[in-house]
Amino acid sequence: MRRVTGWSRYVGWMLTLILLMPAAPGVAQDSTVETLKELQELRKEVERRRNEMRRELMLLRQVLGEEVEPEFEGGFGSLGGMTPDELGAELRILREEIERLRDKITLEQLEARQERFDITGIVRSRLEWSDIDFVSGDADVRQLMRSRIKLTGRPRHDTRVIVEIQDGRAWGSESGVDPTFDADADHIDFHQAYIELQEIYGKQLTMRLGRQELAYGSGHLLGSAAWGNAGRAFDGLVFRYGEKSFVDLFVAKIAEQGVTDENLFGLYVDARLNDGHRAEPYVFLEQDKTLGVERLLRATGGLRIYGSATGETGHIFGYELEGIGQAGEVGNDDVLSYMGSATFRYRGPSWTQPEVRLGLDFLSGDDAPLDGDREAFDTMYPAWHTFFGLMDLFRDMPEDTGNGGLLDFRVQGEMSASESVRVGLHVHHFTLAKGVEKGLGQEADAIVTYRYNAATTLHWGGMIFVPSDAMKLSRGGEDPAFKTFMQLEVRF
């Protein structure tokens, strides 16, 4: 494209002199014979380049199967009596049309080389041993298995179709007289099935329609809950505008209930502040039109700010701050609750990549749940295994603390023991935000991740929870709780 553009610029300042020569004989008479010959040669060069551009345009249209205009089929004429403005306009139109057709051919070549279908998947099996009722001696052992196959179709460069089938079950959960012959497939379903349109009308606009995962920000409110044996997905519509910074607007149907549907609406902004720092303001609206205690109209809004800075020696210091508020109505109660989270991170530059995180999460509680005011914060649809300890004793908030809220002070450390092994230790101190007895207890989680090869990963975790008074009262036991797991995961 530089050749065409550069030539058109060169022609621009010469056109007037060349094309006006026949109308200005005085100039020719005063000019030398050599100058006249040079100008005539330049005029021929302009005409030759013009014809080359017209010929290239005709060939490009033929390659693309587009209709060739009659004026191109009969050959290419001379400049004739064209004025400088007319010739300049024609060259500009030719250049723009050639650029358009070249871009179109390049795009078609990329689409031809792009694979139309892509199949990926993951199969994982996890053994869990748990004694978490705070009464020693009655541990439970179960083997979980989850399999996913994901088909990605690309009929065009700007169109994708995603279909992901999932089977998630516990070993021995098949039913029937002889479970080994079970063929009911109760646990098989579509985890995701959606259409994605990109670059709508040539803009940075993307649309996703169908069953899909919704995961935003830290995951405190909306996460895929990938640790679960089924995972979470929503039936919804998402519009996204932008790339490096973007705005998402979505609606999801939680339950089809006729005229009393349960819906979730959301607006999420991811804005780049500067290198390494971002801000994410958002608001979610939950709606359930059912009358009575199930009636729901609750707005949750917040702001998340996070980033990191790297020193000259490679040391990384990061932070994440988030504040959230809730207001609305649940049943006949008024809602007014809040949550705050802060995390500070350090990562070293050595080959062991040591990382230390200090954090604090606070969820408001309610010590008078029958007074018509709900002050206990609800975490909506979180990525629950990510927060509040790996034992998952506080996965459903505020129910798991009896509306008492939660205060979690945490210290987490991780490092690489080798190129394929990473180890970590997480320690939590839990208390209630509201209540006569606030002490919940302390949890320690040890984790090891071993990457066997590029496709296979082995995870091990061992956890202990030592209860305090509030936990002993609510759970009815006073012994420490234990849990361990071993998970094998293969991706393809």
Give residue spans per PLM region.
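Flexible glycine-rich, low-complexity coil/linker segments exposed to the extracellular/periplasmic environment
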Residues: 369-405
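Bacterial N-terminal signal peptides
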Residues: 12-22
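Signature for the C-terminal beta-barrel architecture of outer-membrane proteins
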Residues: 201-207, 222-370, 411, 416, ...
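Exposed, low-structure sequence patches enriched in small/polar residues
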Residues: 397-430, 473
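Outer-membrane beta-barrel "beta-signal"
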Residues: 479-492
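N-terminal periplasmic/intermembrane-space "pro-region" immediately following the signal or transit peptide
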Residues: 26-138, 352-356, 368
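Surface-exposed loop and membrane-interface regions of Gram-negative outer-membrane beta-barrel proteins
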Residues: 126-146, 152-207, 215-224, 329-335, ...
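Bacterial N-terminal signal peptides that target proteins for export
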Residues: 2-14
